[in-house]
């Protein structure tokens, strides 16, 4: 069963720390393990409420940024996963 990777801010949670109910409800329909991905540093982690998430949160504190492929290599290593064992949910909202 694949692990679901979910982008944190503006996908699973707002920049004020509010969990997007629709996304949470959707994810709860799957039995898969879920991991929230972010680049947040310690200050941002608290600001975005990432310390209160219902799933494990992974961050490298902007070192490197998520735009750098080494972020994902380190995340895979941390969780003992490969690219074939995950599905990545990144969201784009029209404001």
Predicted segments with their positions:
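Substrate-recognition "cap/lid" segment bordering the active-site pocket of phosphatases
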Residues: 42-85
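Acidic, divalent-metal-coordinating active-site segment for phosphoryl/phosphodiester hydrolysis
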Residues: 90-95
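Asp-based phosphoryl-transfer active-site loop
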Residues: 1-17
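Short, acidic loop-to-helix structural element flanking the phosphoryl-transfer center
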Residues: 12-35, 69-73
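Conserved phosphate-coupling serine/threonine residues in phosphotransfer and NTP-handling enzymes
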Residues: 38-40
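Structural motif
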Residues: 3, 85-87
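Short, well-ordered alpha-helix to beta-strand connector turns
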Residues: 1, 31, 54-55
């Amino acid at each position: 069963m694949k692990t679901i990777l979910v982008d944190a801010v503006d996908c699973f949670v707002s920049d004020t720390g509010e969990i997007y109910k629709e996304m949470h409800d959707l994810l709860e329909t799957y039995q898969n393990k879920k991991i929230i991905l972010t680049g947040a540093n310690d200050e941002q982690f608290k600001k975005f409420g990432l310390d209160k998430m219902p799933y494990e949160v992974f961050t490298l504190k902007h070192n490197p940024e998520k735009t750098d492929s080494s972020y994902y290599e380190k995340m895979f290593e941390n969780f003992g996963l490969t690219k074939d064992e995950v599905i990545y949910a990144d969201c784009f909202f029209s404001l």
